[in-house]
Amino acid sequence: MAVPQVNGDVSPRPNSAFLQHLLAYPLISDSIHTVRANEYAQRSIKLGDSAYQTFAAPVLPWLAKPYEYVSPYVARADSLGDKTLDRIDERFPIVKKPTSDLYNDTRSLILFPYNKSIEGRDHIFDVYASEAKKIEQKGLVGQGKAAVSTAFVVSNETLGWLSSFLAAKKAEATTVVKEKVKQ
């Protein structure tokens, strides 16, 4: 579908429901604004526009008559595309979230293992410091005792967490088995 131009400006609203729906997504809209703000992208857009004006614009009047024959099919494809985007909106509501929220969620998900490792390291150092303070013995022997007792404390915490996790999974499995037996 041709978009009318006035003084070289393309109208901001395309005639396609699919494209309007697609441009309503914050991620796509922000991406387009970012590309338009980039000077290299502006040069590419100008080059593409000049190629369009040179090669495609003179041919468009000749394609008007054949376009009349295919326009119902184009409109139907546009309608199907818009309905598909509606289903995507229902199934994946995250596509409507603002770009900054998507960025922050993705960043926190990617950095989750790193942050947990930092927390674990800090916890072990805190346990070691408290064990070294409890022992009150200076020197290499005191540090060795603090290291061994830190290993015991951290192992005990890990086994306690694992025990509670497995107990919850065992209870969950027991209820599933009981439900299967009743059926």
UniProtKB/Swiss-Prot annotation:
Compartments, as annotated in UniProt: Lipid droplet
Principal place of residence: other
Highest taxon in the source lineage: Eukaryota
Keywords: Lipid droplet, Virulence
Transmembrane segments annotated in the record for this chain: none
Null allele phenotype: Leads to thinner hyphae, fewer lipid droplets (particularly in appressoria) and a decrease in total lipids. Reduces dramatically turgor generation by appressoria and subsequent ability to breach insect cuticle.
Stimuli inducing this protein: Predominantly expressed when Metarhizium robertsii is engaged in accumulating lipids.
Family: Belongs to the perilipin family.
Primary role: Lipid droplet coating protein that regulates lipid metabolism, appressorial turgor pressure, and virulence. Appressorial turgor pressure is important for breaching the insect cuticle during infection.
Protein name: Lipid droplet coating protein mpl1
